[in-house]
Amino acid sequence: MHTTNNTQYSWAGSREMCLDEVSVKQYGDIVLGKYGGNISAGAKKNEDGALVWSNGDWEFTVILDGHNSAESVDLVVSTIQAEYENIKVIMNELIETVFRSVENHMLTIFQSSSFKEKCKRVKGETACLICVRKENYIWWLSIGDCLVYVFHDELHKLGQYTLNQRQFYEWIGNVNTFDLPVPCYSSGIRELRTGKNRIVMVTDGVLECGERRYETPLNLYSDMNKNNIELKENVHNILEHVHHQLGRDSATIISWDYENDAYATYPSDQPEKIKVKK
């Protein structure tokens, strides 16, 4: 079920902390879950952030995890928010060029002298993960240690879950990867499988609490696909688990489903599965 209306929402944990509180809301097709941390474990701030845009034809999402203040999160969210009209135009491009264009646009912004000057003036820095889905493809740009997964039964059977790898010494902000002689980040594009693809983005607070259940991707896959319940309820249950595991760090989840009716790629020795998209 896709919305036809444009959906725009952005959030920074400094404005709505959700300490000891799980908040799960839906914006268009996209579910956003927030949890600020367990007060009894010492949680007293939320430095995560998120931005979600969708219009039925595509989704553009950003998840952030700030360090040493939320100022860098506010800066990145407001900077991307100001680019909405430009990005909306880019998202109307043909599938052959759209991901290259959106990546070039984001890198141009992050490497601009004006943005880098603003970064020098903020306290702290942030991890930042951007994901874009259009048609049967997903693109991501990752700075730092947030993760994005694509959950699908075919991929699950082969043990494939994450799109990116966590990088623990990359940030945007006062310490800024885009100030290096060679900026460090990862990006990529994946074809989505035929049928239901569940896209899940998380900050490290989901992974690094208590027994660290969700550092094992299979556990996150299992709990995000439990009992045929609504996506919102799965997200809520995972953040409740973080709370009961005395998670001190804030935990944020962005998730949505994409039902792909296009044929996906198979190897040449499985001719019965190979079909050409008309």
Predicted feature descriptions by range:
Residues 1-278:
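PP2C/PPM-type serine/threonine phosphatase catalytic domain
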